[in-house]
């Protein structure tokens, strides 16, 4: 099993548990250059709020889009958008990535902005 398939397997196991519990989830995806965050409805069919470093407003705020500072900006923005729609409790779906670095920075910023997970 290679590194990518192991990550996908971890992510599938976590998502299965979240679907069974029927909770709204904050899903992240990480690439070397960008980070994406989405708040997804419990049934998984609807994206309720989203933010990423691809957005022009965020990429203009930060010097480089693939670091912890950019992840913190994305975390704060996705939390603000979710709170504006009345969502404050979510489950954090890290998509099999380690809770370290950019993933941790995004999660901490979302918590500071008011999301509960």
Curated annotation (Swiss-Prot):
One of its GO terms (biological process) is translation. Part of the 50S ribosomal subunit; part of the 5S rRNA/L5/L18/L25 subcomplex. Contacts the 5S and 23S rRNAs. One of its GO terms (molecular function) is 5S rRNA binding. The keyword Ribosomal protein applies. Keywords: Ribonucleoprotein, Ribosomal protein, RNA-binding, rRNA-binding. Disulfide bonds: none annotated. Belongs to the universal ribosomal protein uL18 family. This is one of the proteins that bind and probably mediate the attachment of the 5S RNA into the large ribosomal subunit, where it forms part of the central protuberance. The lineage of its organism: Bacteria, Pseudomonadati, Pseudomonadota, Gammaproteobacteria, Pasteurellales. SUPFAM superfamilies: Translational machinery components (SSF53137). GO terms for cellular component: cytosolic large ribosomal subunit. NCBIfam families: L18_bact. This is Large ribosomal subunit protein uL18. InterPro entries: Ribosomal_uL18_bac-type, Ribosomal_uL18_bac/euk. It comes from Mannheimia succiniciproducens (strain KCTC 0769BP / MBEL55E).
């Amino acid at each position: 099993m290679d590194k990518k398939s192991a990550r996908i397997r971890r992510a599938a196991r976590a998502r299965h548990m979240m679907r069974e519990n029927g909770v709204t989830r904050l899903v992240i995806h990480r690439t070397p250059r960008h980070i994406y965050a989405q708040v997804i409805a419990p049934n998984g069919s609807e994206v309720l709020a989203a933010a990423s470093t691809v957005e022009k407003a965020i990429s203009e705020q930060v010097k480089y889009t693939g670091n912890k500072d950019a992840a913190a900006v994305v975390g704060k923005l996705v939390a603000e958008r979710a709170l504006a729609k009345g969502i404050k409790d979510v489950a954090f779906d890290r998509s099999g990535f380690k809770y370290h670095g950019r993933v941790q920075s995004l999660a901490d910023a979302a918590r500071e902005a008011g999301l509960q997970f």
